[in-house]
A protein has these predicted regions:
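Compositionally biased P/S/T/G-rich terminal and signal peptide-adjacent segments
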Residues: 15-41
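N-terminal secretion/transport leader regions
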Residues: 4-15
């Protein structure tokens, strides 16, 4: 015997690194609305593409539609009024400045509870990113009734955790700068646009080290071969967002829902690979 005696031992289990990585990804990617919640499309989305050849535009719409359908959304028929507007241009800086000047209501409707900060709008205008995006969200009741500030509305089931209202996307504007985008796989470009069009992604999200289509431009700049399409992480995030509670008071509750769903989905992916 070495004379060493252990009277008691307390073991505190740490979260698996995977769980911590998932929570960090969700926290970084999620960009909350002015109401401090996570917005999403309600039931239907209609992507429209301008500035690309018709065949490429249709391919992009089809790819977005496939992802939208997978997360339970309906996609508008051909000719529907676009609410996810994708514009490709060689002069994105000039175009964005002109759009904000000529159509201010397309970016912030001050009487509808969908206003984001002027700082956010200034950052959108000043962005030199290959792709930039702007989400306009509408505050609605839990059963989908839109209202303006000051309106009388019937709100059900308000509690400490549930707010009785939610944030739905009204319009998403995505600007693609053809010169800055350069040469990329079309599948990865279309999936990047689908990701930022279906979720309110933080333009400053730090997703380095995660296998995600959101690293498309960062990987290229670092000399790393970008992914070819949405990854399991991206798809799990979207699934989590569209299954998360919507009428919560704070986005943190939604982020928790997303992280749980991602954990389940990614664990399933791991088991699937083991069995292959």
């Amino acid at each position: 015997e070495d004379g060493t005696t252990v009277d008691s031992l307390t073991v505190t289990a740490k979260k698996a690194p995977e769980r911590e990585a998932i929570e960090a990804f969700v926290s970084s990617v999620s960009d909350q609305t002015a109401n401090r919640r996570l917005g999403r499309w309600d039931r239907k989305v209609c992507p429209g593409v301008m500035g690309l050849r018709n065949d490429y535009a249709q391919l992009m719409i089809d790819r977005i539609a496939t992802t939208a359908t997978e997360i339970g959304l309906e996609v508008g028929e051909p000719g529907c009024k676009a609410n996810m507007i994708i514009i490709a241009t060689a002069e994105s800086d000039r175009l964005v400045r002109q759009m904000v000047k000529d159509h201010p209501d397309a970016f912030a409707k001050y009487d509808s509870g969908i206003r984001r900060s002027r700082r956010d709008l200034d950052a959108f205008v000043a962005s030199g990113a290959p792709i930039r995006w702007w989400h306009v969200t509408a505050r609605v009741t839990a059963d989908g009734q839109r209202y303006k500030l000051g309106d009388d509305v019937r709100v059900r089931e308000v509690s400490r955790l549930r707010g009785g209202t939610r944030d739905d996307f009204a319009t998403v504007i995505i600007i693609l700068d053809a010169r800055r985008v350069g040469t990329l796989r079309f599948s990865s470009l279309a999936d990047y646009i689908a990701m930022v069009g279906l979720a309110q992604v933080d333009p400053d999200a730090d997703t380095a080290g995660v296998n995600s289509v959101l690293n498309l431009f960062g990987d290229r700049a670092a000399g790393v071969e970008p992914v070819e399409a949405m990854t399991a992480w991206d798809k799990a995030y979207l699934k989590g967002l569209y299954e998360a509670r919507r009428d919560v008071r704070r986005g943190a509750a939604q982020e928790g829902d997303i992280a749980r769903t991602m954990g389940e989905e990614l664990a399933g992916e791991g088991e699937k690979k083991k069995g292959e």
